Amino acid sequence: MSGVGRRGTGPWPSSNTDAVVTAWLMSRLSDVEGEERSGMARWLLEHVSGQGKGERMVADMRWHESQLDRLAVMADRLNEGEPIQHVLGESWFDGLRLEVSPSVLIPRPETEELVAAMADKVAGLEGAVRVADWCTGSGCMALAMKRRHPHAEVVGYEWSMDALEVARSNARSAGMDVHWIHADALHAEQPETPFSVVMSNPPYIPASERTTMHARVTAHEPSMALFVPDDDPLVFYRAMASWCAQGALVPGGWLGLECHTDKAHEVAGFLEGKGGWKHVDILHDLQGLPRHVVARRALP
């Protein structure tokens, strides 16, 4: 539930000192799992005050009534299972502070690893570089690539108009020039000028896995960005590989894909079996799981 227009309710802290307010907030987060509670409390306190714990201690901070009201509303939303990123209205990704909403996936650390890998590929290319980010969502990957390689031309493709608005807003806030296109990844037209790099974090979770996932994800993040049919889990990978092979990706260009950890080997095998691809590699994430597939389009 959004916090717009919502007011906090008691009980309230016995005083407005930082120590008392911190203890009050911790106790108020009663439905948040114990190991997460202290971290979420810290994020809320820093977000509302604009200061870290040390800064608040040095300043001997006293919390205002309006700030306590915001903390109470935010704590209630967390207790109701809303993601912390939605409660704060923002998420950090590869050094960028990004707006997030229920219209987009919350950026994950694993996706930062794909951006880093593809940024390394961009660094090894000569001449003008064009990068496409399919299923861009919040624009996190496109904007992170633009931050790392300001001279690259970056294009973000997205089917959801609501998500595109979030991406555009993030680009404006970051002061970055990224071109955003409304398009369907499964029926994509060829670009006028081919790309040097294509990357994507497409939907890849089989629909049958919904019941095994945390409600914090399934109830608050867009299903269209998460799930694929059980009988065709590689549908987006096939579409993007075909789009690239038809000319959207230059020969010698790179394709980078985030995958379900149970499907990365299958995606890699599909590219190897299809032909026209070289250097097909599976990259493991920081948890040691097969998360990304990177491949190079073969030269003629």
Task: Give residue ranges: language-model regions.
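Short, solvent-exposed loop/helix junctions and linker helices
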Residues: S15, A19, R62-L68, L105-P109, ...
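Phosphate/oxyanion-binding loops and surfaces in catalytic or ligand/nucleic-acid-binding neighborhoods
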Residues: H47, Q51, R77-G81, K121, ...
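SAM-dependent Rossmann-like transferase core, predominantly class I methyltransferases
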Residues: V58, W63, V73-S169, H182, ...
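S-adenosylmethionine
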Residues: R148, A152-E153, Y157-L299
